[in-house]
Amino acid sequence: MKKQLQNKATSKFLSVLRSVMVLCCLGLVVVLLPSYISKKQSAPDAGLPAITAKVQLISDGLHSPTSVTFPGNGDVWVTEQTGFIRVIKNGKLLTDPLLDLRSKMIKVNGGYEERGLLSIALHPKFKFNKKFYVFYSAPATAGLDHKGVVAEYQLTAKGTVDPNSGRVILSIDEPEGNHNGGCIQFGHDGYLYISSGDGGGQGDKHGEFGNGQNMNTWLGKILRVNINTKAGYLVPKSNPFVGKIGYKPEIWAYGFRNPYRFSFDKLTGQLFAGDVGQDLWEEVNIIKKGANYGWKIVEGTHCYSPATGCDIKGITMPITEYSHKEGISVIGGYVYNGVQLPALKGKYLFADWIGQVYYLKNTGKAWQRGNITLQNIPPNLKVLAFGEDEAGEVYVLTNADIGPANPKGAIYKMVRN
């Protein structure tokens, strides 16, 4: 999961990895990959100032935290890629997990890995029905790498969860181990939105135009379903492709490579998604009903296949993009609606996996990008995800390792300087 290290396996990046491996084999003391990448400077839009924010450590000792949610009682729930939902109570990370999903999942590699327990979402009426939803990677039949499973669980009256009580909502067949998407969020309409990557592999070599443009697969899409039913799910009649022959009716938007993280603006309901690029470009999109975001015809705003002269008719372009001279894997975040950081009010916060945090400002004519500098945070951390609490404050989920083997993950809250 940790994202698109492997999926955006650029030759330059791989050469760095090979160099690191050689040095390690020689027994030399080296500072790993993050030190190399951290020397790359971001290039925000001219005229936008850098904004500084402090961070407050909420918890460390986590195995690659992939998502966070807030059940309303003061606790914090965190998903670890390895398969646990952990609870932070009164500032302390409890030893016993709320839920252990390892028996349902594939075995997660300790090094670089994109599969695992990837996200959690509370039902809009969680206060009353105590239902929540998870996205995890499960074993698959022969010919597939795994399945991306969305499942429902429910707290008991004692506040516990039976690991065998899960109800599977849907399963996505995954041909390879990367580009899994894996984000789930409820929209203001009460429906569950699910992101799915293109199925993995360099350049989405699944047919002439790839899975992203194939409307008869869930891969490379954002899906929208109604989970308020006793079995499976229902397809909302307002989905854009309902009734169209050869189109999966669950599709809300398409043309994605790996929309690893998306979120809704708490105030407006607008849907933002970061889509991880292939070799050259990272992008952020505003997701609209039925829209085509172009992969693998384009990468960002640039022709990908063919490399020149591609037909961009009908493609919705990103609101921002940046090159691999700056980063390697976009991590979608949230529109800031809290009170701790007035300078960020109404701006979209996101990051790159290598650790640079950004904001987007809507000028009315265009979205402009600026840098966010996080103070009192350890150097060379990888950003895995963001979270948002009930008050609209934003959290940054990080890891000091390249994978989930060691408990070097942490959650930080962005706070006033």
What are these regions (language model features)?
Residues 96-112, 165-181, 218, 229-252, ...:
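Surface-exposed loop and turn segments in beta-propeller and other repeat-based domains
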Residues 367-390:
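Conserved blade-ending motifs and adjacent loop-strand segments that build the rim/top face
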Residues 240, 249-289:
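Acidic, glycine-rich loop-and-beta core segments that form the ion-binding/anion-interacting portion
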Residues 41-198, 261-264, 269-277, 326-364, ...:
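Acidic, Gly/Ser/Thr-rich repeat motifs that build Ca2+-stabilized beta-propeller blades
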Residues 148-158, 210-227, 287-288, 411-415:
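Beta-propeller blade signature
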Residues 17-25:
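Sec-dependent signal peptide hydrophobic core
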Residues 1-16:
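N-terminal secretory signal peptides that target proteins for export/translocation
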Residues 24, 28-46:
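Bacterial Sec-dependent signal peptides at the C-terminal "C-region" and cleavage site
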